[in-house]
Amino acid sequence: MIVSAANNIANLQDEINKLNVFPVPDGDTGTNMSLTMQAGKNAVDNFNGGLTECADKVASALLRGGRGNSGVILSLFFRGVTKELKGLSEASPADFARAFKGGVESAYKAVRKPTEGTVLTVMRLCADRAAEIADSGITDAEFFAELLANAKDTLAKTPDMLPTLKQAKVVDAGGMGFCVLLEGMLSVLDGKGEIASHAGSSSEAGQADFASFNTE
């Protein structure tokens, strides 16, 4: 799942960069999130260990490789997730729901003045949705499909939460990056397979997703 997520965001980093207007329009959110996830991917590529050990490797690598504000927030989210998955050989939707809650708490603590309408909001409302459906008897694939749908719905509303985004007629870059990561994970869970790396180019699916967030 981590490899697929890392590949997906690497493929779409340039498109994410184009959305980057907050907190400063430096056009590097996609790059920073991609480089951060690449560190996690490298840590577990060809790794065949258990869930806990895999999660620990990813979290440690992300913390060491976190780039920029978005990368640091992402790395701390995964650190919180890892703490909740510790000791598990496999994870159910209920386990993932607790992990997402832990990830959000960890990410929010890292930001002195959290701003709504950013990736933090997308993460938080995604975790809230996870808690709502955790015990509904759905599969992991159905669970992540619900989370992705929720994240996209929240992302579409970010311009209404943050005036800078509305003025630029874009959605939040970090929030889009988080959606792209979930999309990569879901691809593995729902049987479509691991997304291949085509760094430097955008997949047709990715382009379609971005087109759906045209705020003009």
Roles of regions detected by a PLM:
Residues 1-216:
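N-terminal loops that bind phosphate or other acidic moieties
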